Amino acid sequence: MRLSLPRLKMPRLPGFSILVWISTALKGWVMGSREKDTDSLIMYDRTLLWLTFGLAAIGFIMVTSASMPIGQRLTNDPFFFAKRDGVYLILAFILAIITLRLPMEFWQRYSATMLLGSIILLMIVLVVGSSVKGASRWIDLGLLRIQPAELTKLSLFCYIANYLVRKGDEVRNNLRGFLKPMGVILVLAVLLLAQPDLGTVVVLFVTTLAMLFLAGAKLWQFIAIIGMGISAVVLLILAEPYRIRRVTAFWNPWEDPFGSGYQLTQSLMAFGRGELWGQGLGNSVQKLEYLPEAHTDFIFAIIGEELGYVGVVLALLMVFFVAFRAMSIGRKALEIDHRFSGFLACSIGIWFSFQALVNVGAAAGMLPTKGLTLPLISYGGSSLLIMSTAIMMLLRIDYETRLEKAQAFVRGSR
């Protein structure tokens, strides 16, 4: 006998209907555990889990390949960065198990504490942070370096999700409700720009705006804030000579291929060498220290060179499906009025996809370089740990949503 779960009433949120439409349109492509709304036998999203493992595996393989030349030069060990990345993966796995055991109510309760802790760490890094290429973004703990900016992303999105639960009506009906999150962004932006780290500021700003849109904020508020945001970004670019060089290099990197346009031209050469099937794993020429940051910010170019167009498309599809699953999980959580979980899941999907878009766009010459990692693929301990934690939060949200539906069915069948 086929059992069915009762349909639960959707919250009426402006912007939520768009999320439902996108999710429904793509639902046949990626269905997670292939369950329908009438079945809740499998209590976790298998597709999301395997996509996460796949991206982490691709990341480890490509970090190993791309980092061998620089590892040999810096430490006389070609596998130095691969070993560290392996340690980060083990730590991420341990952290993932812990995250899966924590109910979402825990993150909601301590969201403000997490944000306060992130602000304190951002202050500490300005005082005792280790500097790399003129940017003080890391706190050196010996075996591990912490990048507070990565923790700030997750803690802010938890805080904003909780804020939207508490002040949703104020956000929709009052300008003050809309501006309060912008005030938090402003405080974080000041601390981040002091490092400097414009890329993280852009991610925080865009993701927060998207969350407010889903919560039903008025359109004219977005137009005003976006206009102010664009003006602020332009002023910040003009204030720093290195940012001006990045933008001009993005417009025409071949004008100065050995100066400001060097990194981008080398990245484009990597894509050109890759063609359809690539040069083969380990056969990149650009990673031989022609392309700076080949194992971090520009690892996507090495994927293009070694695995070709096919590898690039595969990686992008996997990233897209992870982002879609996040939005779908968020939609289902909002359907049963798990608002904190729903908003947080949507924010993770937007964050994941936007950061990947900026990284890929910078490597392909479509966007100025921002120093953002490719989620789960680029080398970077803090990024890997925080991103994997965010993915495990999605799995926990999905589990709680399915559990709620199953319990609703049991109650309804009595």
From Swiss-Prot:
Cytoplasmic side: 1-12, 69-86, 133-174, 218-221, 323-342, 395-414
Top-rank lineage group of the source organism: Bacteria
Topological region Periplasmic: 34-47, 108-111, 195-197, 245-301, 364-373
A single GO BP: peptidoglycan biosynthetic process
GO cellular component, one term: plasma membrane
Reactions listed under catalytic activity: [GlcNAc-(1->4)-Mur2Ac(oyl-L-Ala-gamma-D-Glu-L-Lys-D-Ala-D-Ala)](n)-di-trans,octa-cis-undecaprenyl diphosphate + beta-D-GlcNAc-(1->4)-Mur2Ac(oyl-L-Ala-gamma-D-Glu-L-Lys-D-Ala-D-Ala)-di-trans,octa-cis-undecaprenyl diphosphate = [GlcNAc-(1->4)-Mur2Ac(oyl-L-Ala-gamma-D-Glu-L-Lys-D-Ala-D-Ala)](n+1)-di-trans,octa-cis-undecaprenyl diphosphate + di-trans,octa-cis-undecaprenyl diphosphate + H(+)
Subcellular location: Cell inner membrane
Pathway field: Cell wall biogenesis; peptidoglycan biosynthesis
Annotated EC: 2.4.99.28
Enzyme class: transferase
Topology within the bilayer: Multi-pass membrane protein
Molecular function via GO: lipid-linked peptidoglycan transporter activity; peptidoglycan glycosyltransferase activity
Effect of residue 311 to D: Thermosensitive. Fails to localize to the division site at 42 degrees Celsius
Main location: membrane
Signal sequence annotation: none
Keyword tRNA-binding found: no
Positions of transmembrane segments: 13-33, 48-68, 87-107, 112-132, 175-194, 198-217, 222-244, 302-322, 343-363, 374-394
Outcome of mutating residue 170 to K: In ftsW201; TS; blocks division at the initiation stage
Keywords: Cell cycle, Cell division, Cell inner membrane, Cell membrane, Cell shape, Cell wall biogenesis/degradation, Glycosyltransferase, Membrane, Peptidoglycan synthesis, Transferase, Transmembrane, Transmembrane helix
Entry similarity comment: Belongs to the SEDS family. FtsW subfamily.
Subunit text: Forms a complex with FtsI. Also interacts with FtsL, FtsQ and FtsN.
Job description of the protein: Peptidoglycan polymerase that is essential for cell division. Functions probably in conjunction with the penicillin-binding protein 3 (ftsI). Required for localization of FtsI.
Record text about domains: The periplasmic loop between transmembrane domains 7 and 8 is essential for activity and the loop between transmembrane domains 9 and 10 is involved in the recruitment of FtsI at the division site.
Protein name per the record: Probable peptidoglycan glycosyltransferase FtsW
Species this chain originates from: Escherichia coli (strain K12)
